């Protein structure tokens, strides 16, 4: 059940926004206060740059899960001088009290947990629309939807036929929203694109979209790949998923994980964390992989590496973590045992062929938990309609690990906004010394004390005493 959106007029905030309930703002503020104690990186950036305000003049269109942790990110960007407009990058991931806390500060936010796809694309458009008729000059993206909207809309201005044949439900609503906007303002997207100085991207999926544009020569502005900062991918993707996956499964189903047979599809950083998560609670975990290196890693960690087709009838829990398309298809779904749990922790909902299940009997148990009766008579439990389970059925990653990721995001925004003319129309990563700085900012909070190199030791391994300590090609 979607909460009725509350408009800014009703709130009398003097700011345009769409949220579920402004009365949750006080609750959101209390949780924000707790989160700040677990986000030392962001707090350090506020202290370091708060007076200087390096983002003064930045107009940031933010498309990223509207959680309590994201609210801390937003407040940091504003503290550093930026103007911000924000939408969630997933229809189920918003925490309504977090959105209310941001709206109460007169920051434009457009996010409601359980929003429709039509609303989702409307809200993504809203972050590109400044009240004075201007445009954003920066994008902070998660999954690439805001960047992709600007790019596809620009193409449609030149050739409307690119919107003729949507391939799925998501594209149907996306294409309709672009057509609607073009009817109102035929040059909206090209004007917006021309103003963008750079984009910073949070996720593996969004980064892949950026590299694809770079390869084809279509990338119109510099981009920073935040995902491949070591302090993002090796922490958020791995340790974040290690805690949030089982949290979401247990909140959704109350199932006992110990003793269950679980299959994790994909053994990248997200898959590694997911496998550890399930094993840690006593599940017997198998891995499905296409990459021989990742498959060998899984085998060496003691996981059984299998093909989905060979074990689909045995597994109690299925988790997709690939970032790919149609990983679990209808022929697999129909063979699953009774009460098998099916979920996705990759970015988009098309890893599982949810569309093929629409003709079956659905019984909604509670928000984002559905029983689906298969032709065999067996029922499977689908979580978050195949979208991100840890944000749909729980609250995502813990604050501490998100501080790593979001500290990288702020540094990337500062870098592109203040030095954008030094970058070409390519995808970059943050330099190693900033990666190490992000890690250093988080050590005190967990009581970690660094050993220091002597000058002789540093010379012996040919690194500066103060770092960086590893070459760029080092894999960690």
Swiss-Prot record:
Which EC number(s) does UniProt give?
Answer: 3.13.2.1
Query: What coarse category fits the chief subcellular location reported for this protein?
Result: cytoplasm
Can you list the GO cellular component terms from the UniProt entry? cytosol
In terms of Gene3D superfamilies, this protein maps to: Adenosylhomocysteinase-like, NAD(P)-binding Rossmann-like Domain
Q: Which PROSITE patterns match?
A: ADOHCYASE_1, ADOHCYASE_2
The record's keywords, sorted A to Z, are:
Cytoplasm, Hydrolase, NAD, One-carbon metabolism
Catalytic reactions on record: S-adenosyl-L-homocysteine + H2O = L-homocysteine + adenosine
Annotated GO biological processes are:
L-homocysteine biosynthetic process; one-carbon metabolic process; S-adenosylmethionine cycle
Residues at which NAD(+) binds = 203-205, 237, 266-271, 289, 324, 345-347, 390
Explain how, and how many, cofactor molecules are bound: Binds 1 NAD(+) per subunit.
Pathway given in the UniProt record: Amino-acid biosynthesis; L-homocysteine biosynthesis; L-homocysteine from S-adenosyl-L-homocysteine: step 1/1
- Residues annotated for substrate binding in this entry: 67, 142, 202, 232, 236
Pfam families for this protein: AdoHcyase (PF05221), AdoHcyase_NAD (PF00670)
Its required cofactor(s), as named, are: NAD(+)
What is the annotated localization of this protein?
A: Cytoplasm
Disulfide-bonded cysteines? none
**Briefly, what is this protein's role?**
May play a key role in the regulation of the intracellular concentration of adenosylhomocysteine.
The protein's name in its UniProt record: Adenosylhomocysteinase
Per the UniProt record, the lineage of the source organism begins with: Bacteria, Bacillati, Cyanobacteriota, Cyanophyceae, Synechococcales
UniProt gene name: ahcY
